[in-house]
Amino acid sequence: GDATFDQKILDAHKLHVAIKVTEELLYDNAFNLENYIIVQFGKALANAEEDAFLNGNGTGKPTGIFDGTGGGHLLNTLAAALKSDDMLDLVYGLKRPYRKNASFIMNDATLPSLRKLKDNNGAYIWQPAYQAGEPDRILGYKVETSAYAPKDGIAFGDYSYYNIGDRGNRSFKQLNELFAGNGMIGFVAKERVDGKLVLPEAVQIMKLKVD
């Protein structure tokens, strides 16, 4: 049947990171520390977003793709070690319209067992990229890895149905007074963001047996 969309309301959840540095280091003209801090804040916030968009439970944070209630549809939970047929089930368990733009998301720790899987003809189902910058593939579909993806799960789907709402720009603030008594300068970076999968059937989740 036709896809049905439930109303999803994006909220504004706060993500923030903070650090302290010595005044001497801050005012050392030989090193552009302030610019370095801003770059590091950007990386830290991006990591926090990635974690939240994959694992968040929707309480004070986005609802992640792997969340058990608001995330992708749980296709199956394996009781034995991963087999190539399980990957076929995951791919074809996703409805055809979503397979066109689908890809896998998994933890790096899942790769060793996946790369050893063979089909019934003895051929590896893992298809390595032959050009720099191109993704590896499984059964013809791109493989994306994340250090934040759970080690006991693989997602397969069209992630364009995951809506992200940014509530204003990232803000960076220098706190000159708060730690002045200790000879320190504080820096804080904040942003407000939310994310939800508006169509859970667009992403399938397979839970793995982890020793």
Pin down the residues of each PLM region.
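Structured, hydrophobic secondary-structure cores that serve as assembly/anchoring elements
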Residues: G1-D211
